[in-house]
Amino acid sequence: MVREKVKVSTSTRTRQWKCVESRTDSKRLYYGRFILSPLMKGQADTIGIAMRRALLGELEGTCITRAKSEKIPHEYSTIVGIQESVHEILMNLKEIVLRGNLYGTRNAFICAKGPGYVTAQDIILPPSVEIVDNTQHVASLTEPIDLCIGLQIERNRGYGIKTPKNFHDGSYPIDAVFMPVRNANHSIHCYGNDNEKQEILFLEIWTNGSLTPKEALHEASRNLIDLFIHFLHAKEENLHLENNQHDVTLHFFFPFHYRLVKLTKKKKEIALKYIFIDQSELPPRIYNCLKKSNIHTLLDLLNNSREDLMKMEHFRIEDVKQILGILEKK
């Protein structure tokens, strides 16, 4: 466990954030405590409420959403040689914590032979996904039988509630909890005199191990930026701001959006729709990803946001940075 003493300084007006406590309670329970200061009266609550909502509702997670076995007649049946009922096995699969960046649906498998215990370690996963806690229990095989279950893995946010209908192919949907943050709280400490009252925001984050609290904080912050960036763009367009007076602020806080907007403006006089991506010296893997998503010209590319690009199969955040670097040289 790492813990730092919180020092309140009234001599500086520079706003700073800091991790003051960090610990790992178990493989599936991480804790982090952060502070942000100094803030004016009322700002801590504004930031704390928004951040808590983003942490609990906006972050994506990876879960098992379906299990399939042709030998299972229905969800509430029992199988000879297995201690748990099918329903109990499904509930155990629901609790498995996964870590990974994937888009769309991926398949995984469990193939085990009894007698013995089946744990998360027995799940055969795609390369982009890994188990957080290999010891999580799935089933107990009491006889020398083979247990083979096909699994479906998805990445999403919030809750995934299964539809109440019968599946006759041995496929059973699993209610998924995609949220990597288990809980988040904020509190406020006030200091200073009545004339210059200031606040410190304390933010506590508990995660399931698929993200650290610091990673969750960064991701929630980026999601909030993505939500609010549209208002800044609208202000730029409607008021016709001159001389790029907000360039420094935008470049520091919103690097991707800033560079993309500047890049589009810079190339307005160029017939972007006639410049094809195969002229841009992109690496073969990135080029193939773009082509599969029907992105053929620079105009097609600039009309996609970072989120659009990240939804493409096998696309990474490093690829976005590489694309921007190549386009800025054009």
From Swiss-Prot:
EC number(s) given by UniProt: 2.7.7.6
Biological-process GO terms, alphabetical: DNA-templated transcription
UniProt keyword list: Chloroplast, DNA-directed RNA polymerase, Nucleotidyltransferase, Plastid, Transcription, Transferase
Compartments (UniProt record): Plastid, Chloroplast
Region (Alpha N-terminal domain (alpha-NTD)): 1-235
Gene3D superfamilies listed in its UniProt record: 5' to 3' exonuclease, C-terminal subdomain (1.10.150.20), DNA-directed RNA polymerase, insert domain (2.170.120.12), RNA polymerase, RBP11-like subunit (3.30.1360.10)
Catalyzed reactions per annotation: RNA(n) + a ribonucleoside 5'-triphosphate = RNA(n+1) + diphosphate
Function of the protein: DNA-dependent RNA polymerase catalyzes the transcription of DNA into RNA using the four ribonucleoside triphosphates as substrates.
Name of the protein this chain belongs to: DNA-directed RNA polymerase subunit alpha
Gene: rpoA
